[in-house]
A protein has these predicted regions:
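Short acidic, glycine/serine/threonine-rich loops at helix termini
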Residues: 1, 17-20, 57-60
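Functionally engaged cysteine thiol sites
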Residues: 10, 20-21, 92-95
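Internal, well-ordered alpha-helical segments in soluble enzyme and binding-protein domains
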Residues: 5, 15-19, 88-91
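Long, compositionally biased charged/polar accessory segments in the mid-to-C-terminal portions
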Residues: 27-211
Length: 211
């Protein structure tokens, strides 16, 4: 048939509630800095602005007044929580489609660590990997239209474990959502738990299920 199916490997899908909470936090910070009106929206949001390259990418926000805000991903509270798997959807911690269980013809994924294996193709803008899952006739047509290099499966998985396994649910995920529901600022909720928090977590785990 003519049907060609493609899926992609993702880190996980974050909570919509958390995303909205983060945006509200940034709008609140913006208003506090300017002392002006109430900023209600953004013109543009980029998770990975690569002006400084992939390895030093920024999260970029452009507010309704066209002012731009950029922050290094490792210092941005939202990205810190996302990278540490703090607020992925519950199903993401037990993803049923990793390890090529979707049965698609092709799978796309990030080739993290390519700079250590094939530095000659690393442009610091991001390199993708294409898995050919069957002998679909479309393969030859596709390869004639792209620049590619054959690599080993082990080399790819070494830098991107999402291809074959889900991330563990963080022990303090429940505490994070509890803080958020109590009205803590987003940046304070994202902080790792202190001693009191850890004691409370231990008590709560006795009565609650994990993700």
């Amino acid at each position: 048939g003519n049907l060609v199916t493609v899926d992609f490997v993702c880190h996980g899908v974050p909570s919509q509630k958390v995303w909205q909470s983060y945006l509200n936090y940034e709008l609140k910070m913006k208003q506090g800095q300017t002392g002006e009106g109430e900023f209600k929206s953004f013109k543009k949001i980029s998770f990975r602005n690569k002006t400084n390259g992939w390895k030093k990418y920024n999260i970029e926000l452009i507010f309704s007044d066209s002012q731009r805000y950029m922050q290094y991903f490792a210092e941005n509270p939202y990205m810190i929580g996302f990278i540490n798997n703090l607020y992925l959807r519950p199903s993401c911690y037990h993803c049923a489609f990793r390890s090529f269980r979707s049965h698609s013809n092709f799978t796309l994924a990030d080739f993290w660590g390519v700079e250590n294996i094939h530095p000659e193709i690393d442009d610091d803008k991001g390199v993708s990997v294409l898995f050919v899952n069957d002998n679909n006739a479309y393969v030859e047509k596709l390869l004639n239209r792209i620049s590619y290099k054959k690599v080993s499966f082990d080399d790819v998985v070494l830098g991107n474990r999402s291809i074959v396994s889900s991330y563990d649910c963080p022990q303090y995920r429940h505490l994070f959502f509890k803080k958020l529901s109590l009205g803590f600022d987003f940046n304070l909720s994202i902080l790792k738990p202190n001693l009191f928090d850890r004691v409370m977590m231990k008590i709560e785990r006795t009565f609650q299920n994990k993700c």
